[in-house]
Structure formats: C-alpha cells, structure tokens
C-alpha cells in the first residue's frame, strides 16, 4: 500500500478519534478534559494525536513520565501538560524549563521542587496526588497528610494547580469501592478548603467513571482508553457512550505456497498440516507487538472479509496463516491483523480476550518499528516512521 514503508503499518483513523472526543464532550458537559496521552497515546502516536485532541475539546494533557511531556513540548504543543508519575530530583529543573506540571505526593518532593524553582526564578505548577485506595503513589487521606499539604502549599514558588486520585475498580459493575474512594477524596479536598488552600482543578474521573458516574466529574475528567475507541471493561454501561476503535494493524501477504499433508510450520514443529494446504506468510511478528501467544490462543486475521487462522508459532518478524478456504489469494493482498471489515472483527478487544489481557495492553504493545499512518476523510494525512 505504501511503497516507501515496510508492508506492516498501524492505521490511525482521525475521524474516529474526533467522533470519540465529541461523545466524551457530550457526556462531560463543560468539564475540563485532561486527555491522557501516556505510552505514546496508548500506541497511537502522541505527537500526532495530541493536536487533534486539543482541537476537539481537550484543554490539558497528561502523561506518565517527563520524557513523554518533553517530546510533546518539542513537537510544538503549548497546552498544559501534567506528569502523572514520578520525576527524579535530577530532572526537576528540566521539567520547569519546559513548563511541565509535576505530581507531588510527599512534602519532601514539594520542597525539592520549590528549591529548584526559586533558584531558577520560576513558578512550579503541581498536582497533589492522593492514594484513596489504589495503593500507588499519593498522600493518604488522613489529618497528617492535610497538615503536610498545607505546609507544602506555603513553600515559595509553588502553585497548586490541581488535586487528583485514581480509581481502582470504577470499571466494575459494583461501585461500592469507587464511592468509598470518592468520599475519601472529597474529605481531603474539603479539609484543604477549610484550611484556605485554593485548588483550581479536582480530577478523579477516569474513563469508567466518565461513562458510569457523572456525579464524580468535578472540575476535570481524565479520559484515556475511551478516546481511542475502547471501553475500559465489559461491565461499564456501553449504551451511554458510542465509541469507534481508532487503530487498525495491517500488513500484506509476501509469500504463498502449497504444502502437502504432514508438513511442519514454524519453530518447535508444533503445527503440522492435516491436509494439503495453502499457506501464506506475513512479514509481521512479535517484535512488532503482534503477540507470540496468539497462535496458541487460536488467533485469526481478516483477509477478503473472512477469518483465517494463524498456523505455527509467531516468529520475531514473520508469521503464517492458512488461506486454503479463501479464493484467489495473491501476494500483496491486504491483511487486517487488528481491526474490522464489514462486520468481521478482530479488534484489540477480541485480541485481548484471546490473550487474557486488556485492550489497553494490546494497543500499547504495537512497537515503534511499525509506522503509524494517519487517515482523514479516507485520505492519508500523515505518516510517522519511528525507525
């Protein structure tokens, strides 16, 4: 399809991304949308995805680590960007240089940021992280933490921009624990307000809470997987939000051969033809993020609006499929590894179910040696080659 690329690519449909953002805007009713673009926008390509999100309702961006934020700044993104995770002391000055908002979950971290900010004559914008029941980073919801947060709020050159927490099980049908977390979060926010601490944005609603619990939206929400067209679990109310998967993973057939009955295919000789078969080779493997486990789990691809099974172990750079039941298969025919075609589906959802994992992991697995091809109105509007 693209003469200047290897015949494996991730196709990113920007029209579907815009559609998903419109759905999110409709359900969030004017809240600040903090678009989560960590892990290279869940594998979709943060540099190309972020501008579209900002044009279509996102007011802020969130990443996991500082280098992701710096990449966006160097790419011309000037919207507020927060780092959700840990940043080493040695990188605080760099963070301030790029005007990145840092997460703070101890007085000591805030003090270090303050000292660097004073020396560099900058104001450090921070977000206070609370551990309301996830067991990760964050101040615990107790009086001691209130005192520490109050104390750090008085540090020079520190500006508290927001306060946030993360739900452990908002994607489950039983919302009891989520409500417990939310109540702890509100208790801390209210306690800080009573101490005179002004916080601009409270944000705790993730993708699942955005869908199921509008009362938890507060000033800001943090959509992640739903922007990319997938639901956080099968237990959320899918009727509240219509989503379209944004990414497809595609390749082309590079070799076809007839194989007699009783011939082995791939490493370990695990697959043996039970009859005369037509076997096609695809130039994609686990180094591209196409999991080696898919063969053992009954993985299939889409070819000519039909499913074809993977045969033999998936190699690092190649895999094989049985196309005996499909007519007129030729070298160069397009194959959908992840996606759908006229109702035939093998999306990240189906692949995740086969692998016993989640759709998040499937899209994030697609490696950097797979070019991202951006489509709008059916036309290619951009290609990002990482290697």
UniProtKB/Swiss-Prot annotation:
EC main group: isomerase
N6-(pyridoxal phosphate)lysine PTM positions: 38
Keyword Membrane: no
E.C. number(s) listed in UniProt: 5.1.1.1
Domain of life according to the entry: Bacteria
GO biological process terms, semicolon-separated: D-alanine biosynthetic process; peptidoglycan biosynthetic process
Record-linked InterPro entries: Ala_racemase, Ala_racemase/Decarboxylase_C, Ala_racemase_C, Ala_racemase_N, Ala_racemase_pyridoxalP-BS, PLP-binding_barrel
Catalytic activity, reaction form: L-alanine = D-alanine
Listed GO CC annotations: cytosol
Cofactor: pyridoxal 5'-phosphate
Active site (record annotation): 38, 267
Pfam family, one: Ala_racemase_C
List of residues binding substrate: 136, 316
Pathway noted in the entry: Amino-acid biosynthesis; D-alanine biosynthesis; D-alanine from L-alanine: step 1/1
Single GO MF annotation: alanine racemase activity
Family: Belongs to the alanine racemase family.
NCBIfam families in alphabetical order: alr
Entry-linked PANTHER family: ALANINE RACEMASE, ALANINE RACEMASE, CATABOLIC-RELATED
Functional summary from the UniProt entry: Catalyzes the interconversion of L-alanine and D-alanine. May also act on other amino acids.
Protein name in the entry: Alanine racemase
Gene from which the chain derives: alr
